[in-house]
Every structure is written in structure tokens, then in C-alpha cells.
Amino acid sequence: MKAIIGHGTWYDKVAVEIIERERRLGRSLDLLRVESGVAASGIPHIGSLGEVARNYAVALALREQGYNSEFIVFSDNKDGLRSVPKGLPKSLEKYIGYPVMEVPDPFKCHSSFGEHMISLLLEALDECGIEYRFISAVEAYKSGLLNEEIRTILENAEKVSRIVKDETGQEKYEEALPYFPVCSSCGRIYTTKAYKFLPEEGKVLYVCEGMEIKGRWLEGCGYEGEADYTKGEGKLSWKAGEFAARWRALKIRFEAYGKDIADSVRVNDRISREILNYEPPLHAQYEMFLDKSGRKISKSVGNVFTPQVWFRYGSPQSLLLLMLKRFVGTRNVSVTDIPQYMNELDELEDIYFGKKHIADEKERAKLTGLYKYVWLMKPPAKPSPHIPYNLLTYLAKVAPKGSETDFIVEKLRRYGYSNLTLTEELKRRIGYALNWVRDFAEIKETSVELSRNEEKAIRDIIEALKTEVKAEKIQNLIFEAARRNGVQPKRLFRTLYRILLGMPHGPRMGPYIVAMGRENVIHSLERALKEGGGSPSST
């Protein structure tokens, strides 16, 4: 068997690949920088956080290999507003083409639209515990961080144009420099066309002639002027050099990117190599999060699922689990997935603390490693009480108003959680369940595939529950139904837990069924028979 690398995860393998690559390139290993570029032009969704979380996990993996790493969050707040995201005021339409930091905040709580949007993402990163060095594009251009790279790119504008055409077929930079000045007359950025570089003066000449944005023509004001790139009076085109400029100026060694910008990354890789003489960072491509209808979750189409929504019903670690458990492939995701990830996090914790045995050493290492990354290498010292999300939401639904927490804790102790204490973690979990019940009627039940023998046993249980009311007798009749139908009792209990709680374990079944209400349990079991029955006999 091959040796396990680091903590056995994909992130550890990438970290080793980065280190070996940097050695081959002969570059310093004193500080290895990882970057995420983040937009400020729309409401940040869970995909925005996903990109940052995955890049940060690589930065952590480099540290776990014994190297200093720094994680940079680069805010694209010099970009212009290309469209008004759905749900925001139509009055913002008049600001299309303006830099997002010059667009007023429609919520009137920040200095600008861009400031508001980036604050939402940074708030989510802080909630997750992600540590980062924040760099604002506005400040980077103004401070001269990218001056050398801008100059080299503008001096080689014809070569940049050929690279863009080779890689994408676009010819727009045959007539324009890959630089957008901010028009000093109307204030827009995308309507300007830079047509001449004055290297001695550090300036470009431009005309504000207009530009097609999102399928419609945005008319320029006609002004002709000059912009000083050394003073941050414009920005590079991100498709034709800005990524490359950042990589070289900041000595970035790794950056993952979304499938939707693959062409731009390919162009920037070549610009970095062929024009800036800097071997670009190692990359990994990830795919998009989709909503349940299969559409890409997007700032502009109105199906935004934000980290803040997730944090109302689930922990930051459960969201990081969604982000980090798999890197490739698109995933359909919605708020209804939160209970599943909360329960899955508990299962990972059982593996990490040795309460659940995984025989395969590599699989065990990968899962315990994933748990560490979900906790950003600061896992808890001891396991927390694992109470199924469905159980908490049921108790939250029937709890008397004003004393919900006391009621839930008392009931849990009666269900067999005898040593339960009201820790901060338990308070948070109860809070998630209470929020769920306030906002949603119930958790969508999951389908469970049943063998024919399990199906027969469940039919027996349904019949018995129509007359039996005592918890202890209900507990015993489940054992009897299992034996009578040739099903291992442990397997039948696991199946019942999956049907009723969405996970393979839970509180003592007899008292739980009484508390849930026999009619409710019968309904759930009948639904399971309808949806999951008919597979071959198995014990």
C-alpha cells in the first residue's frame, strides 16, 4: 500500500505537488502564497465561499507539510457593475459601467455597493474561522503594487492580443490596449477604449466610446483623455493580464479556479510565462454549485444561496464539509441539504474520535483528515453530543413557547441522553432547529431502500403500533419483528433510524416513537414502504 500523504486528503497531495514543483522551478520555499480572487459586484453565494475555502485548505496543507504559507483574498473591487442582481433596486441600472466602489449602497449601511458586497463575504469567512490577508484591487492599483506588471503588459500589447486571439478567438485587443481607464468625465470604466500607451509618462490615451455589456450597448460620453496607471486611474482587463499581474507581483504559487473562467486562466497563464517571465501558479479547476433545478447558483440570476442563510440553520463546519469533501464535479445544493451535512459531520466526528471503526487505513485517514480540515486544523478536544437534526426539529416543533430550550433538553434526557448538559454547542444546535421550525414546516424525508424481509418486518411494526402504547413494549416488538422476518435486529434498527431520523443511529427507539406520536411514525413507515420497498431479500 502506498504511504499516506499528510492527512490523506486531496489537499495534502496538492500541497506536496506544489512543493515539488517549486523545487523544480528553483524558487524560494520560504513563503508559499495561495490566492483567491473574489468579486465585489454581486451578493456572495456559497460558491463564492467554496472557492475561498478550498484555496485556504491548500494553504493549511502547506503548513501541515512544514512550510510557511500565506493566504490572500484579493477583492476585485475595481471592477465595474455589469448588471443589477435580481432582487436589488432597479434604480441601480443607471450605475451600470461604474466601478462598484463608486456605486451607492442600496442598503445604506456601507460607503458603497462594492463595500457592502465584499463585507458579506468577509463576514462569512470570519464566521468559518478562515484566516486571510485582504488586498483591495483599488488600493493595489493606487499603491503601485502592479505598476511593473502593467507597464510590461502595455509594452507588449500586440503580443497579448495574439495570445487572447489564439486561446479564445477574440479580436477586441487588436484595436484596444488590455487596460480600462476610468473616464474622468462620466466616471464609467467599461465604456473607455485605451488606444495608445505613453511609456515615458506612465499614461494611456483613451476615448469613452461605449461597450457591449451583457448583450446590450452601453453608450460612452465621447470624452477623450489620458489616464495615469501609476496612480490607479484604471485597471487591467482580467481576461487579458490582470490575473497574471497579480500572480507575479504577489508571487502566488497556487490558485484554484472555477470552470466558468477556464479560458481566462489559460490566457493569463501564457501572459505570465511569455510576457511577465513568471511561471504561473499551480491550478486546480473546480465546477459550479447548482440549485435544485440544475441552474448555476449566480449573483445575477436571482437564485443566490448565501452563507448567511446556511448559518441560520447549520454550523460553519457543516458548510465547510460541503465545500471540502469533494473538489471536482458539479453539485446540486439547497437549504434542504443542511440537516444531512449536520448529521454527516457528526458521523465524521465519530470516526475521528474512534467511536466508529473504519477498517481500511487509507479511507480512515482520509475521513479523519477531512474532519481536521473542516475544523481548519483546530478540531475539538472531545466529541459533542450527537443529536439527530430531525429529532431536534421535532422537539422544537412541539416545545412550548418561551421555554423551548429547557423542554428540548428535558425530553432528550428522557430519550436516553442522560448525561446531557446545556453546553454552548448544544444551545447552537437547538437554535438551528428552532430557526428551521420557524421558517420551514418540516425536513424533507429521505428515501431508504428496503429488502423484502425488512419490508415485511416494517409491516409487522406498523400493525403492532396501532395498538401498543408503551415505550418498552414497542422496543421489544421491534426485536420480535426482526427475528420473525429473518432480519438482524441491528440492521432493522439502523433502517428505522434512517427512515425516521435520516441517519443510522439515534435515541432509544421505543421512547422516541412514543414521543414522536405513533400515528406520525406509522405515516413515515408507510411512506418508506411505498418509496423504498421491493429490493431482493437480504439480512
Indicate residue ranges for each PLM-predicted region.
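Residue-level signal for inorganic ion chemistry
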Residues: H45, I153, N268, S315, ...
